[in-house]
Amino acid sequence: MAAMKSLATAILVVLLLRRLPRGLSQNCSAAIGELMTCGPYVLPGSNGAPSEQCCSALKAVNHGCLCETINIISSLPDHCSLPAVNCAA
């Protein structure tokens, strides 16, 4: 199960980095890559608090980089011709 979580996180990071604008990608790809340490804490069913490594990696990510990455994640369903995800429902 842990291997599947790590693989899913790695795939997501690679996909996100490919969608970032070139300049932003060059500036934040390493920081986003460091967030791989947070993989076990961002998937449904995870338990416990994030590790110190995860928190340090998150602290190091530029706010603009993090927001752009979240926007890209939010746009994925549209780019895949899928209905939008409504997390409030």
UniProtKB/Swiss-Prot annotation:
Record InterPro entries: Bifun_inhib/LTP/seed_sf (IPR036312), Bifunc_inhib/LTP/seed_store (IPR016140)
Tissue spec. comment: Tapetum of anthers.
Gene3D superfamilies: Plant lipid-transfer and hydrophobic proteins (1.10.110.10)
Disulfide bonds: C28-C65, C38-C54, C55-C80, C67-C87
Keywords: Disulfide bond, Secreted, Signal
Sequence similarity: Belongs to the A9/FIL1 family.
Record bears the keyword Signal: yes
Subcellular location: Secreted
UniProt xrefs under PANTHER family: PROTEIN YY1
Protein known as: Protein M7
Pfam families according to UniProt: Tryp_alpha_amyl (PF00234)
Stretches of the chain forming a coiled coil according to its record: none
Signal peptide annotation: 1-25
Keyword Secreted tagged: yes
One GO cellular component, as annotated: extracellular region
